[in-house]
């Protein structure tokens, strides 16, 4: 299996490789090939409680110049790629791996690429490290199974801790987060290897040029705490200011006696009528949509206007009829359900329910308003004198009662002087041909 440690410098990549990979492998007697700065046999042997000779036999330190040619396969006589026997069941650790397998279009040498392809098949594992996985050649990156990302916690003032986020591969070069944890540095691990280059003396965490999150929040925290304290004081004072003072003398009986006659309850001209709380809203537990349907009962009487069964589904239409015999609203079952009502079709009609509110719609008889089928006839007085128009229908007396009081007239036909179309006579026309020179 190929494990990749990623993170900024001093985040804990090499620390994790030593503590969680190299030391456990040596303790189990496993061969380790490490390209890591400053590993010390004597200190590792003392830390593990092993003989220094055993550590020197198991731990092989690889120089930078030997990495590319050491970790490579060989071909047998048949041309088959074979991994050297010394790497079988071994652990390979390479720091700054991008220096040896840099990301470029040029493919790796077949011997090198086959080494990483065959290492896991021969019982070997590898831990490789760099600051950015995209600096690594794709032929090696595609074979990474686990990726661990290391993060410093100096931004929140935790110099002695670091954060590790764990990823697992889903496809070559792609990873999915599977967890993470915050760990504490073990000071006993640092002397076992060189975390800094030889001769470097400034090993403290650099803190200039910025602030951690707590320093940035200190001023805001002080302001919010002050405002919060003032707010809590006035909040508590609001509920405790009206409590009776135990040292305050009690009011006399004459001051607490209730008025017993008319007008005694008036003080400064204002009646001492107790304020009645508003009545509870019976529809308070309904939504706005449910309330709309419930309030239709104030506008009219509910009625089942039609009912049908289509296939295995019931269809029905509900109306609300007002006092003027007009339909103020009509909804079908699907609309009522959309408005939040439970609808059930029963033998006597339709039952609507929303919580504790229930309405029943039955098919009570109702006659829809019908407009008059007969045309109205208007009788007008011929001289327009003060009379009103008589209104009559085909089945009435033609407004005879009005005609008894208003003098009527007859509309007669009279010819016009110039004639009336089409009774006027047609125009007579004549044509003539003027005399020609031959006739003259």
UniProtKB/Swiss-Prot annotation:
The chain crosses the membrane at residues 213-235. It is a single-pass membrane protein. Residues 386-405, 413-440 are annotated as: Disordered. Residues 417-440 have a biased composition (Polar residues). GO terms for cellular component: host cell membrane; membrane. Isoform G1P plays an essential role in phage assembly. It is required to increase the number of adhesion zones between the inner and outer membranes of the host cell. The extrusion of neo-synthesized phages occurs at these adhesion sites. May be involved with G4P in creating zone through which the phage assembled and extruded. This is Gene 1 protein. It comes from Xanthomonas phage phiLf. The gene is I.
